[in-house]
């Protein structure tokens, strides 16, 4: 198996391909990306047969911006016989995976694939039974063993392969299933909720998204992102010239500051979170975020960078590099992650966590 398949947002295949080619080369792995426009997936074919597995093990999935999922795959299985589609799939996986922990029969995230999804649901049950009989799947689901992927690109055509649970997306098709809260002021609230799921390990939520923390939301109107912070019982300063939803103001946890998010300067010194979803040039937003981090005005931040029409991967990489350069210049150790989330559109969500403060005499929690 010499291919790595990556799922992405429809229309962002070129960015995903540019990124995997770049990141693979940094790992000493060379190959070429096959891109079909608006297919919502990319195939990276490695020149060396073992290199696909090397990428699946050693290229941190968390370092990829445009990929929703990454798994190793073999050749395309075509023209599966309608009377027995199971046997060829089992045959392809024989000797490749042993006692996998989970089976995911998936499709690309496109409108055209919705009909295929119905078939995948029906196909999963008999396939799971056959894979367990062949010892390709364990008799019970476990997160400690590889995930078996069967990826249908058309009726009767699929790729088969595997991913490692310590280096993949835990979500089916790489998409967290979130429900829009009826009392949220806008659908943008799902972006921040998804960001929490993607960037913060579940066992750290109680510590890092804790009751009573102080947070700032820049460009908050009408309050979609503020809603997520209020829901976690934080005190929020919502900065925007536009009005906030009355339902949020009624909680007593929100202070509305009628100011420009770019000009606002915090007076508190104990702000844990700053979040920002402003429609502005990405370089300008990145510069503002760097200023907050360098000055120690917050410990963690999640913000969106709106993407240009062209050279989107290059633009995002440049923005993140400029933040990293300013942090390095001031001796600040930080973790930076970025991802184009399912609920993002022409944008990328970035998370930065400062490990220690830039302000003298002040310590972070770690």
From Swiss-Prot:
Keyword S-adenosyl-L-methionine: yes
Top-level taxon in the UniProt lineage: Bacteria
EC primary class: transferase
Matching SUPFAM superfamilies: S-adenosyl-L-methionine-dependent methyltransferases (SSF53335)
Gene3D superfamilies: 3.30.2300.20, 3.30.70.2810, Vaccinia Virus protein VP39
GO biological process: methylation; rRNA processing
UniProt family annotation: Belongs to the class I-like SAM-binding methyltransferase superfamily. RNA methyltransferase RlmE family. RlmM subfamily.
Name of the protein in question: Ribosomal RNA large subunit methyltransferase M
